[in-house]
Amino acid sequence: MELKVLNISLNSLNTVEVDDTIFARDFNQALVHQVTTAYMSGSRQGSKAQKNRSAVSGGGKRPWAQKGTGRARAGTTRGPIWRSGGVTFATQPRSYAQKVNKKMYKGAISIIFSELVRSERLKVVKEFDIKEVKTKNMIALLKVLNVKDALLMTDELDENLYLSSRNLYHVGVCDTQSIDPVSLIGYDNVVVTELALKKIEVML
């Protein structure tokens, strides 16, 4: 398969040959969903904690005698039915991580890229020419590329590109080492440099 390589003026410079087994795979919704869900689950902090009856301070002594008072027996004032008592099924810190094989993860990334190519939402450019850190330069670049909501991908993190775009909520910047399924499906368009595309092909 061949993809057009554009310059910043959207003129086609040349084409780049890409592997069909990576950029022309059939869509597998179940795999993409599983990998995306696993990635999001792994991002959860999982530090929520509540106190059960044994973790609440106090309540060591019986509030009244077992027999003779006429009241219902009670062994502690920290049971779940008491005011200031513990939580019945208290949540504890836990990991929400799900295991995903490398082959499955790479397969899902490849399928997402294939779908981007099919829907013409993947643009390949020679390079991003951002000489200085200015948001207006980034807005001008997006206007030329005819995209509003986009993930810009480079082979190595471009500091000028990142700093120029960080004030735009609908624009993301990453390098090939930081690719994740949530970012790829979270933007309307993905704009990738030619060098980054070749790196991705080697990685997948």
Curated annotation (Swiss-Prot):
Segments of this protein annotated with the region Disordered: 42-85
Gene Ontology CC, one term: ribosome
SUPFAM superfamilies referenced in this protein's UniProt entry, alphabetically: Ribosomal protein L4 (SSF52166)
MF terms in GO: rRNA binding; structural constituent of ribosome
Positions with biased composition (Low complexity): 68-79
Bias-annotated ranges (Polar residues): 42-55
InterPro entries linked to this entry: Ribosomal_uL4, Ribosomal_uL4-like, Ribosomal_uL4_dom_sf
Keywords, alphabetical: Ribonucleoprotein, Ribosomal protein, RNA-binding, rRNA-binding
A Pfam family hit: Ribosomal_L4
GO biological process, one term: translation
Role description: One of the primary rRNA binding proteins, this protein initially binds near the 5'-end of the 23S rRNA. It is important during the early stages of 50S assembly. It makes multiple contacts with different domains of the 23S rRNA in the assembled 50S subunit and ribosome. Forms part of the polypeptide exit tunnel.
Family listed: Belongs to the universal ribosomal protein uL4 family.
HAMAP family xref list: Ribosomal_uL4_B
Subunit structure, interactors included: Part of the 50S ribosomal subunit.
Descriptive protein name: Large ribosomal subunit protein uL4
Organism lineage: Bacteria, Pseudomonadati, Pseudomonadota, Gammaproteobacteria, Candidatus Pseudothioglobaceae
